[in-house]
Each structure stands twice: as structure tokens, then as C-alpha cells.
Amino acid sequence: MNAKDAVGLRIQVLCAKHEITVNELARKCGVAPSTIYSMMNEKSKNPGVVSIQKICDGLDISVRDFFNDSLFENLDPVIK
């Protein structure tokens, strides 16, 4: 799995865990729902750290907690 896909899946998992929709998350983060949706699908090729931090702030978790998941353990190499 590549990092972009892992970020998108992690957002889905965290929304389910916190029992909120993407629209609710966007409201809490102060970003447009389209920003989050683009991070979750093919439109965003490189989710930015600032956007991820806003999502973490909206979920009241740290960036460390966001990435502290097995999804990020065996990512595909970017440089081959």
C-alpha cells in the first residue's frame, strides 16, 4: 500500500471510530469536505502535513496518534 492510500484509509477508520461523517470532520477541522474527500480518493496525490494536522486537531488526536497504526508499517517504497 502506498502512503496516500494509507492516509485515506486511516481517515475512514478514524471517522468510524469517532462515529462522525466526513462532513462533520470537515466542520470540526475548519476545512472544506472536498479537501478531506480528495485525501481519501485519487484526486489528492500527496496529502499535506498541514491538512493532516487539521484533521488531527478536529479529532483531538496528535499527529503521532494518526500515524501510529499498522497501516503505515509496510508502505510501498517511493524511490525504487
Where are these regions (language model features)?
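The alpha-helix within a helix-turn-helix
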Residues: 15, 26, 56
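DNA major-groove recognition helix of helix-turn-helix
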Residues: 15, 40, 51
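Short alpha-helical DNA-recognition segment
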Residues: 19-38
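Residues within the helices of the helix-turn-helix
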Residues: 12, 23, 53
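A short, Lys/Arg-rich alpha-helix, primarily the initiator
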Residues: 1-20
